[in-house]
UniProtKB/Swiss-Prot annotation:
NCBIfam families noted in UniProt: S20
GO biological process: translation
Parts of the chain that traverse the membrane: none
Alphabetical UniProt keywords: Ribonucleoprotein, Ribosomal protein, RNA-binding, rRNA-binding
GO cellular component: cytosol; small ribosomal subunit
Upper lineage: Bacteria, Bacillati, Cyanobacteriota, Cyanophyceae, Gomontiellales
UniProt name for this protein: Small ribosomal subunit protein bS20
GO molecular function: small ribosomal subunit rRNA binding; structural constituent of ribosome
Function comment: Binds directly to 16S ribosomal RNA.
Gene3D superfamilies: Ribosomal protein S20
Similarity comment: Belongs to the bacterial ribosomal protein bS20 family.
Length: 99
């Protein structure tokens, strides 16, 4: 453990920030899983309700990813990659349904 006062403060701040970042990352993962579940439900039985649910969960996931990027929890390229992956999942099923 640190002996110097400023070092002790830095340890406390680092721990606080780590927990804050962890909550954002966890929320992003949770919303991503919910979105993929909604896409799977839509692909199993395509309907307007299932599509609406998938789009709603996509919007929530995008919002949380953008907030995490804005607060510096994840890098902007990482956020862009996550968002592209989410959008691609639904677009694949929409393309299959259209053809």
């Amino acid at each position: 453990m640190a002996n110097i006062k400023s070092a002790i403060k830095r340890v406390e701040i680092t721990e606080r920030n780590r927990l804050h970042n962890k909550s954002y990352k966890s929320a992003v993962k949770t919303l991503t899983k919910k979105y993929f579940d909604a896409v799977a439900a839509y692909s199993a039985s395509p309907s307007n309700d299932a599509l609406q649910a998938a789009q709603t969960s996509l919007s929530a996931a995008f919002s949380k990813i953008d907030k995490a990027v804005k607060r510096g929890v994840i890098h902007r390229n990482n956020g862009a990659r996550k968002k592209a992956r989410l959008a691609r999942a639904l677009n694949r099923h929409l393309a299959n349904a259209a053809s």
